């Protein structure tokens, strides 16, 4: 990540680099926002992402998050989606992002109103 940031700065010193990665090394928090990777749209993935995000925070990575609602799999059932959103609002990176077409809160109807 330092190389990427240096390249952007060399290209234009008026631009502040912003990188997103799913893994890194000690010190990655100085260079990039980290997300937990492409997760499944299931209850277990929500549980595992909570543990992953807590671990990242304890490791000094303050700018982190996950794909709210899951990335791979069927569209999440309404209760699962609400729980993902409730968890996601406390993360610096809140992104409803998946291979499905329902990528906004409004795509899930009144369940989040």
Residue ranges and their predicted role:
Residues 1-113:
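Catalytic-domain carbohydrate-binding cleft regions of carbohydrate-active enzymes
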């Amino acid at each position: 990540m330092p190389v990427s940031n240096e390249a952007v700065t060399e290209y234009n010193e008026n631009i502040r680099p912003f990188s997103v990665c799913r893994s890194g090394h000690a010190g990655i928090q100085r260079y990039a926002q980290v997300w937990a990777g492409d997760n499944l749209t299931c209850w277990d993935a929500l549980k595992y992402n909570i543990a992953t995000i807590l671990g990242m925070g304890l490791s000094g990575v303050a700018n982190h998050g996950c794909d709210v609602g899951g990335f791979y799999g069927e569209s999440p059932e309404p209760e699962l989606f609400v729980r993902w959103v409730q968890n996601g609002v406390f993360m610096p990176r809140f992104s409803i992002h998946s291979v499905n077409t329902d990528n906004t809160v409004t795509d899930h109807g009144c369940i989040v109103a």
